[in-house]
Amino acid sequence: MKIKRQIVVFDAPDLAAESTFWAGLLGGTVVADDDWHSVLVDGVWQLGVQLAPNHVPPDWPDGTPQQIHLDLHVDDLKAAHEEAISLGARLLKPADDLEAAEGFQVYADLAGHPFCLCWG
């Protein structure tokens, strides 16, 4: 089997808010259709957001319902944190040690999907 394209797709009740959040965080743009938005970075499709009016966000860290999450590796955690928060992310779990050589912080996007900003 040859996979031609691999895309992460998030369910969200508000397509515009969710796709704008991810486009802002990834430095991309949104291409909008009626019930689907695509997020492109440098013209390349990075992820999709599909309309799910009854979307229920996971109850992190319990994971009910269990959902995928993204690990986004960054060079500057402080700058990435500030950008994520300014776009509407919520910090769910701060890093145990910001001075450690590697680590992560857990956030939720506007629809409640967890993601991590990682370093090291």
Locate each region found by the language model.
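Short, compact, well-ordered microdomains
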Residues: 81, 90-118
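Short, charged/polar, Gly/Pro-enriched secondary-structure boundary elements
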Residues: 44-48, 56-57, 113-115
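Core segments of cupin and vicinal oxygen chelate
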Residues: 2-3, 9-52, 86, 92-102
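A cross-family glycoside hydrolase active-site/sugar-binding cleft signature
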Residues: 50, 71, 118
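Vicinal oxygen chelate
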Residues: 5-13, 41, 58-83, 103-108
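A broad, low-specificity signal marking well-ordered, structured residues that form hydrophobic/aromatic
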Residues: 37, 47, 68, 105, ...
